[in-house]
Swiss-Prot record:
Its main location: nucleus. This is Zinc finger protein 304. Induction: Down-regulated during embryonic stem cells (ESCs) differentiation by retinoic acid treatment. Signal peptide: none annotated. PANTHER family: ZINC FINGER PROTEIN (PTHR24381), ZINC FINGER PROTEIN 587B (PTHR24381:SF304). Keywords: Activator, Angiogenesis, Chromatin regulator, DNA-binding, Metal-binding, Nucleus, Repeat, Transcription, Transcription regulation, Zinc, Zinc-finger. The keyword Lipoprotein does not apply. GO terms for molecular function: DNA-binding transcription factor activity, RNA polymerase II-specific; promoter-specific chromatin binding; RNA polymerase II cis-regulatory region sequence-specific DNA binding; zinc ion binding. Deubiquitinated by USP28; the deubiquitination leads to the stabilization of ZNF304 from proteolytic degradation. It comes from Homo sapiens. Expressed in undifferentiated embryonic stem cells (ESCs). Expressed strongly in colorectal cancers cells (CRCs). Expressed strongly in ovarian carcinoma (OC) tumor cell lines compared to non-transformed ovarian epithelial cells (at protein level). Expressed in lymphoid tissues, thyroid, adrenal gland, prostate, pancreas and skeletal muscles.
Length: 659
């Protein structure tokens, strides 16, 4: 194109014709298959850029004027008001994609309030100069679409500028949604057939009808699609077909990067960012941006599930959900990641996965600024700020912020352990627990403490261990002020104050505050001792008991008193010892007011008041309040004298033995 025209062109007004390249039949046949695919990809990319930009030009107030410039046989008509070039071509096949872009521009123009230009003999108003020229030719009696080869031209407007609102027919006063609809209506009303082919002199009311007729008249299709074998009149229509095969999504949302096939889908999507909500559920008050989302949501209240899977019988409220579910049975994964080759059954899953490679996190929390790659993760995160826990356990009334947490919690009541270790056959209620357990068999300890070099199989175990070095106890009980290094330990501790004991033993009816305590307790009934010492073969019902026992063999005493330097094999023994230095006696007897440094000492003391003697001798039936007293008594029956005095010797010892 001439440099003068390029300089004069308004930069913000972009047409797809500016970036589209036409091929004749002869030129197309010279291209190799790879070159044709390259042509398709380049044209699709150009179309995506034009469709995404969507620039428009505001009408000016000057009186209308026209300028014409001839460039390589193409008549360029420029209107001063719009600042746009309208191209007048020799007869070509109408381009459906360009027509779609025009309709898109007109649709977007319906949302804008721009001043329109008034021209012509009948003082009608037009938003597009192409429509103005078409209308003028009705007054002049000209045919606007003419397919002859003698140079007669027609105005083909595909400029993506967006002006105006309504299109009104002056003859009948009828309002139509776009200029093409108005033009078609007027030609029908006036009995005008403005599109004529010179070979047969047949006229048509629409350019698309002329184009179809020309293809029938010529009896040949010039361009074929390799994907489906169909033939087309021009490269533009071929490109339209190939867009379908290529799954083109030319409309991109700039804030989050999502892409869509249609402009209407992009407009609906943008309501998410604007916060526009117009459809509210009367049952629960939940609001939705789109009406069809509300209708889908309402099926949850009615419980209707019309779509049933023929493989497993599972029912769904939506057909698309059923289609997605059926891919579980077929194993279909048609969406491949171009970076790592990983395949997915849903395009949405692929989009989410690709954000791992790009690092994109489009969903940002407006409270703390933290960003997420998935919207559902943001929703879950925001519940930390709001404190919302919408998922309630019907058994114990406990609330959860995520449905997955409720499902995991529900297994406590049902006892379900769906995850099995293939090595030892052990079952687990959580998949994460199974993964951690497998490291026992593999011996994998990939997480190493930088302070002491100790290795762990789980990252969270390493994090918990590192608190030993820092001494941090960030989790404090609001009732008693006691601090803990782990949040779950604080939660367990708080049950002491609330008295909550939701876990019941099915054998004896005893209740426990923690599920782990119930599991350990049940070993009393079963007699299970799964933890064996590899030194002496002694078995224990608790893993912690085995660890303490092994220190007898190793001599390890890791817990040292900072006051006197005395060392102990367990932290509980050290805590009890420190009370000697502090004089703390926190456990008080409610009967006599006596204080004790250890809870076990208080329990033994209370038996003095209650007279309880739970330890009974199996030989004579004598009962004792302490197990140590029973053990000492039983030696009288066995004759065992384990402790011999070697301090005395000589005649005195001999005389004592005689006695």
């Amino acid at each position: 194109m001439a440099a003068a025209v390029l300089m004069d062109r308004v930069q913000s007004c972009v047409t797809f014709e500016d970036v589209f390249v036409y091929f004749s039949r002869e030129e197309w046949e010279l291209l190799e298959e790879a070159q044709r695919f390259l042509y398709r990809d380049v044209m699709l990319e150009n179309f995506a850029l034009v469709a995404t930009l969507g620039f428009w030009c505001e009408a000016e107030h000057e009186a209308p004027s026209e300028q014409s410039v001839s460039v390589e046989g193409v008549s360029q008509v420029r209107t001063a008001e719009s600042g746009l070039f309208q191209k007048a071509h020799p007869c070509e096949m109408c381009d459906p994609l360009l027509k779609d872009i025009l309709h898109l521009a007109e649709h977007q123009g319906s949302h804008l309030t721009q001043k329109l230009c008034t021209r012509g003999l009948c003082r009608r108003r037009f938003s597009f100069s192409a429509n103005f020229y078409q209308h003028q030719k009705q007054h002049n009696g000209e045919n606007c679409f003419r397919g002859d080869d003698g140079g007669a031209s027609f105005v083909k407007s595909c400029t993506v500028h967006m002006l105006g609102r309504s299109f009104t027919c002056r003859e009948e006063g009828m309002d139509l949604p776009d200029s093409s609809g108005l033009f078609q209506h007027q030609t029908t009303y006036n009995r005008v057939s403005p599109c004529r082919r010179t070979e047969c002199m047949e006229s048509f009311p629409h350019s698309s009808s002329l184009r179809q007729h020309q293809g029938d008249y010529d009896g040949q299709m010039l361009f074929s699609c390799g994907d489906e074998g169909k033939a087309f009149l021009d490269t533009f229509t071929l490109l339209d077909s190939q867009m379908t095969h290529a799954e083109v999504r030319p409309f991109r949302c700039l804030p989050c990067g999502n892409v869509f096939k249609e402009k209407s889908a992009l407009i609906n999507h943008r309501k998410i960012h604007s916060g526009e909500i117009s459809h509210v559920c009367k049952e629960c008050g939940k609001a939705f941006i789109h009406l069809h989302h509300l209708k889908m949501h309402q099926k949850f209240h009615t419980g209707k599930r019309h779509y049933t899977c023929s493989e497993c019988g599972k029912a769904f409220s939506r057909k698309d959900t059923l289609v997605q579910h059926q891919r579980v049975h077929t194993g279909e994964r048609s969406y491949d990641c171009s970076e790592c080759g990983k395949a997915y059954s849903r395009s949405s899953h692929l989009v989410q996965h690709q954000r791992i490679h790009t690092g994109e996190r489009p969903y940002k929390c407006n409270k703390c600024g933290k960003a997420f790659s998935r919207k559902d993760t943001l929703v879950q995160h925001q519940r930390f700020h709001t404190g919302e826990r919408p998922y309630e356990c019907s058994e114990c009334g406990k609330f959860f912020s995520q449905s997955s947490h409720l499902i995991e919690h529900w297994r406590i009541h049902t006892g379900a352990r769906p995850y099995e270790c293939i090595e030892c056959g052990k079952f687990f209620s959580h998949n994460s627990s199974l993964i951690k357990h497998r490291r026992v068999h593999t011996g994998a300890r990939s997480y190493v403490c930088s302070k002491c070099g100790k290795a762990f199989g789980c990252k969270d175990t390493l994090v918990q261990h590192q608190i030993i070095h820092t001494g941090a106890r960030p989790y404090e009980c609001s009732e008693c002020g006691k601090a803990f290094s782990r949040k779950d330990t604080l939660v367990q501790h708080q049950k002491i104050h609330t008295g909550e004991r939701p876990y019941e033993c099915g054998e004896c009816g005893k209740f426990f505050s923690h599920s782990s305590n119930l599991i350990v307790h049940q070993r009393i009934h079963t007699g299970a001792k799964p933890y064996e010492c590899n030194e002496c073969g002694k078995c224990f019902s608790h893993n912690s008991s085995l660890i303490l026992h092994q220190r007898v063999h190793t001599g390890a005493r890791p817990y040292v008193c900072s006051e006197c330097g005395k060392a102990y094999i367990s932290s509980s023994h050290l805590v009890q010892h420190k009370k000697v230095h502090t004089g703390a006696r926190p456990y008080e007897c409610s009967e006599c007011g006596k204080f004790f440094s250890r809870n076990s000492g208080l329990i033994l003391h209370q038996r003095v008041h209650t007279g309880e003697k739970p330890y009974v001798c199996s030989e004579c039936g004598k009962a004792y309040s302490r197990s140590s007293h029973l053990v000492r008594h039983q030696k009288a029956h066995t004759g065992e004298r384990a402790h011999e005095c070697n301090s005395f010797g000589g005649p005195l010892a001999a005389s004592l033995k005689l006695v």
